[in-house]
Design a protein with these regions (language model features):
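N-terminal Rossmann-like NAD(P)+-binding domain of SDR-like oxidoreductases, especially those catalyzing
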Residues: 1-185, 229, 235, 239, ...
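C-terminal substrate-binding subdomain of Rossmann-fold SDR/epimerase-dehydratase oxidoreductases
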Residues: 19, 25, 32-33, 40, ...
Length: 349
């Protein structure tokens, strides 16, 4: 039986690395696209390359360069394309909105056009990574596939463009093109500037005496958090269906940033006590020293206060459900950060 070939844009990211591992276990031939940059930025996938050199291939490319995308599609001739590449940091999207739109919106269009013009339209299945940030200022709780979009950031707006463009190409050209509307999903591979990883790494450093204080933004923001490893399975399942469609991928459970902080502190055996209200609320340790506080510079120009997904459709049609609880997720992230920090400390000695 011929091996299936997958092409992953965003291979060096959190989702890209987990998806590559998942597909290799299913005996896929996996091709990943990475941008040429001054740093290698392959730490999330180095272990995969060492283990599966014959089935794992890396290529240089860029979503903003239609020529490179066309070349890759025609050269690799994939069965499945996963577009996980993005400028995905919401706060950063306000600073570089033009770049965010070029990558997150026009990048998707470049892939869709590449598939259309490749002569492989009937062969290729396409997955577009959407985000709960498209719902933004939510019009209903929980959010489903039918909930109206109200994005509150250049990132969210760009992803709405990609979502509808994917549907447009599906309906106009009979392309097998699908959207996954993924709610927050975390892991030890999450970037250090994202709030969950910022919390686990920051509190781990405080525990080890490497840092005195953790500064956060809106600790009352509520999110639906799952594990990236669980979510990439859903991405694959979406492309295994008989008909292309769009799915909300979420846990259906919601927690505040403050709740996640408390979970991590408990895992690290750091006793904290919250004092104050609103923006002035702070967490104190046993010695009555402030170790967590808020700063307005980490607030967004337009906040998204509450996101909660309804994964009913995914459960029913994909037979998918998340395996990792918020407690298990926090524990895994904390343990990995402690391991990384300890290893780095030994190297310095």
């Amino acid at each position: 039986m011929k091996k299936k070939i997958a092409l992953i844009f965003g291979i060096t990211g959190q989702d890209g690395s987990y998806l590559a591992e998942f597909l290799l276990k299913k005996k896929y031939e996996v091709h990943g696209v990475k941008r040429k940059s001054s740093s290698l930025n392959t730490e999330r996938i180095d272990h995969i390359y060492e283990k599966d050199k014959s089935l794992f291939h890396l290529h240089y490319g860029d979503l903003t360069d239609a020529i490179s995308i066309n070349r890759l599609i025609n050269f690799i001739k994939p069965d499945e394309i996963y577009n996980l590449a993005a400028q995905s940091h919401v706060a950063v999207s306000f600073i570089i909105p033009n770049y965010t739109a070029n990558v997150d919106a026009i990048g998707c269009l470049n892939i869709l056009e590449g598939i259309k013009s490749s002569g492989l339209l009937k062969k290729i299945k396409y997955y577009q990574a959407g985000t709960s940030e498209m719902f933004g200022k939510v019009t209903e709780i929980p959010q489903t596939e039918r909930t109206s979009f109200y994005p509150r950031s250049p990132y969210g707006v760009s992803k709405v463009f990609s979502h509808w463009m994917t549907i447009n190409y599906r309906e106009s050209y009979k392309m097998f093109a699908c959207n996954g509307i993924l709610f927050n999903h975390e892991s030890p591979r999450r970037g250090e500037t994202f709030v969950t990883r910022k919390i686990t790494l920051g509190l781990a450093k405080i525990k080890l005496g490497m840092q005195k204080k953790l500064v956060l933004g809106n600790i009352y923001a509520k999110r639906d958090w799952g594990h990236a490893k669980d979510f990439v399975e859903a991405q694959w399942l979406i492309l295994q269906q008989k008909k292309p469609d769009d799915y909300v991928i979420a846990t259906g459970k919601q927690y505040s940033v403050k709740y996640f902080v408390n979970l991590v502190a408990k895992e690290l055996k750091i006793k904290i006590k919250w004092k104050g209200k609103g923006f002035n609320e702070k967490a104190y340790n046993e010695n009555n020293r402030v170790i967590i506080e808020c700063n307005k510079k980490y607030f967004r120009p337009s906040e998204v206060d509450s996101l909660l997904g309804n994964p009913y459709k995914a459960r029913k049609l994909l037979k998918w459900k998340p395996k990792t609880s918020i407690n298990e997720l926090a524990k895994e992230m904390v343990q990995e950060d402690l391991k990384i920090l300890s290893a780095n400390d030994k190297k310095k000695r």
